[in-house]
Design a protein with these regions (language model features):
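N-terminal small-domain helix-loop-helix segment of the aminotransferase-like
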Residues: 1-72
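Helix C-cap/helix->beta junction micro-motif
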Residues: 2, 109, 167-168
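Generic structural signal for small/hydrophobic residues in well-ordered secondary structure
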Residues: 8, 25, 50, 68, ...
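Short acidic capping loops at alpha-helix termini that bridge into adjacent secondary structure
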Residues: 62-68, 88-91, 136, 198-201
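Conserved PLP-anchoring active-site segment centered on the Schiff-base-forming lysine
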Residues: 84-106
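A short helix-loop-beta submotif of the ANL/AMP-binding
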Residues: 108-114
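Active-site phosphate-binding strand-loop segment of PLP-dependent enzymes
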Residues: 120-187
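Conserved core segment of the aminotransferase class I/II
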Residues: 194-248
Length: 248
């Protein structure tokens, strides 16, 4: 009702999906096998394309200790992660202000979100994270670029969180949904590029923001290999397989 007003209430981009994606739909529909269930963790061509993207854009070379799982968006990736690494009563650390869906997913899993403040510039306070860790803590969640603040965490800060998680045998969950939304020369860094950190690092990605695929429900996660069986069981139970039409 207010022409020209920009809504900051939800992360909805102003542009549509790429034309070539829309053009592919009719071709997809014409192939009978495309209407059957596909692999729980994603189709091979997309998994290969994601691996290439991670290497060229994020500095992540997928190794034998890691695997990619295609999901129905980053929210599902987070839910998969929480269910795979926790038991009811466990705790997960969220930095404030936090993304509300993360809190809801943690609560749905019967766990407790532990809220840790950031500084006056919405940057990470490592000492406060350390103080919040208990014997029930299972993970620390970072979002960079951040939703809702827009803050981008420097490489050194993310490395410090990742190192802390590795030292304390916690998981570092980094949500990179807004990886392309950086400005004024600020660069996005993925903790997945940290050497020797892959065993405790979980990365979440979404195609909703980068490509305008919000209603297509498509995203992916990078997880340690030892979580693969658990995540596949969770995703098979909830979804069976990610939307096949969106994977093409």
């Amino acid at each position: 009702n207010s022409p020209g007003t920009i809504s900051l209430g939800q992360g909805v981009v102003s542009y549509p999906p790429p034309p070539q994606a829309i053009e592919q739909i009719s071709q997809f529909l014409a192939i009978p096998d495309n209407h059957k269930y596909q692999p729980v963790h994603g189709i091979v061509p997309l998994l290969d394309a994601i691996a290439t993207k991670l290497k060229s854009e994020n500095g992540i070379d997928i190794n034998d200790n890691q695997c990619i799982v295609v999901t129905a968006g980053a929210n599902m990736a987070f839910m998969n992660a929480v269910l795979a690494i926790t038991s009811p009563g466990d705790e997960i650390i969220l930095l404030t202000p936090y993304y509300f869906n993360h809190e809801m997913a943690i609560a749905m899993a019967g766990c407790t979100p532990v809220l840790v403040p950031t500084d006056e510039n919405y940057q990470i306070c490592l000492d406060k994270i350390e103080q919040a860790i208990t014997d029930k803590t299972r993970a620390v969640v970072t979002i960079s670029p951040n939703n809702p603040t827009g803050a981008v965490y420097p490489q050194a800060a993310l490395e410090a969180v990742n190192r802390l998680c590795c030292d304390r045998q916690l998981y570092h969950i980094n949500d990179e949904t807004y990886e392309y939304f950086t400005y004024n020369g600020v660069q996005h860094f993925s903790p997945g590029a940290i050497p020797d950190g892959s065993d405790r690092t979980i990365l979440l990605y979404s195609l909703s923001k980068a490509y305008g695929f919000a209603s297509w429900r498509i995203g992916y996660m990078v997880i340690p290999q030892h979580l693969f069986v658990s995540v596949k069981k969770i995703q098979d139970t909830i979804l069976i397989c990610p939307p096949v039409i969106s994977q093409y």
